[in-house]
């Protein structure tokens, strides 16, 4: 998904930077508030960032100028809500661009918009909807991980299509081609990421159950950690 350096025209790079900036600034404020008012959640915050960094560093060949990989942003979206992931995702993308040659600085705005903004919001929306409908926690986590990944690549496909429209079918035709290529690798990766998310949250409930309870990650309407942690072990 990381669009490489020099792939997008300068004007489009500037547009994506401008589109991402308000979300990132708001996210930075939320991260500072989270650390200041809830210092006990710093390890969970670090876990969310590490998950995004590690999973999105897996680089598989795909569309020229981009790549396929999991995103890992669903974890942070479920734990701390999407605004936090806008800022943390930007930090991850900067490190990857500078240290791993994964992505680029000029395309940082576009990559942030797709992976750190749209992906977390779509995944979180699915998680909340599942919760309101009374679905199991495991399903909500799976959907958050699965859809945050897929939606990221949908946005990336259109970003590339705007830069390289098809001569005959235009932007929509190009987007269809990019989506088709990404789907080959990304659908299986998204499913695997969803399953990994369930396993990760099982572990987190065992080691940080009270913190997850306080963040609102719970089964049903029960509020006591003792009642919920054993149940999560079987989701």
UniProtKB/Swiss-Prot annotation:
Similarity section: Belongs to the CbiM family.
InterPro entries, per database record: CbiM (IPR018024), CbiM/NikMN (IPR002751)
GO molecular function: cobalt ion transmembrane transporter activity
Function: Part of the energy-coupling factor (ECF) transporter complex CbiMNOQ involved in cobalt import.
NCBIfam families listed in its UniProt record: cbiM, PRK08319.1
Subunit annotation: Forms an energy-coupling factor (ECF) transporter complex composed of an ATP-binding protein (A component, CbiO), a transmembrane protein (T component, CbiQ) and 2 possible substrate-capture proteins (S components, CbiM and CbiN) of unknown stoichimetry.
Pfam families for this protein: CbiM
Protein name: Cobalt transport protein CbiM
Recorded topology in the membrane: Multi-pass membrane protein
Domain of life of the native organism: Bacteria
TM ranges: 6-26, 43-63, 85-105, 108-128, 133-153, 181-201
GO BP annotations, alphabetical order: cobalamin biosynthetic process
PANTHER family linked to this entry: COBALT TRANSPORT PROTEIN CBIM (PTHR43627:SF1), PTHR43627
Pathway participation: Cofactor biosynthesis; adenosylcobalamin biosynthesis
Keyword terms: Cell membrane, Cobalamin biosynthesis, Cobalt, Cobalt transport, Ion transport, Membrane, Transmembrane, Transmembrane helix, Transport
Subcellular locations according to the entry: Cell membrane
């Amino acid at each position: 998904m990381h669009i490489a350096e020099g792939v997008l025209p300068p004007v489009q790079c500037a547009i994506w930077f401008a589109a991402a900036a308000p979300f990132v600034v708001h996210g930075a404020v939320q991260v500072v508030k989270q650390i200041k008012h809830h210092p006990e959640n710093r390890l969970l915050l670090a876990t969310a960032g590490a998950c995004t960094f590690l999973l999105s560093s897996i680089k598989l060949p795909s569309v020229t100028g981009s790549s396929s990989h999991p995103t890992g942003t669903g974890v942070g979206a479920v734990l701390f809500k999407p605004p936090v992931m806008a800022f943390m995702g930007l930090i991850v993308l900067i490190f990857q661009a500078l240290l791993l040659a994964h992505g680029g600085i000029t395309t940082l705005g576009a990559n942030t918009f797709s992976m750190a903004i749209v992906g977390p919001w779509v995944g979180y929306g699915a998680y909340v909807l599942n919760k309101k409908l009374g679905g199991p926690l495991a399903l909500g986590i799976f959907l958050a991980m699965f859809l945050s990944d897929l939606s990221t690549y949908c946005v990336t496909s259109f970003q590339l299509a705007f830069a390289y429209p098809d001569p005959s079918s235009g932007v929509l035709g190009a987007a269809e081609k990019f989506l088709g290529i990404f789907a080959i690798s990304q659908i299986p990766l998204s499913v695997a990421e969803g399953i990994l998310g369930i396993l990760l949250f099982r572990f987190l409930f065992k080691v940080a159950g009270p913190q997850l309870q306080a963040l609102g990650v719970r089964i049903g309407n029960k509020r006591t950690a003792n009642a919920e942690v054993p149940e999560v072990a079987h989701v």
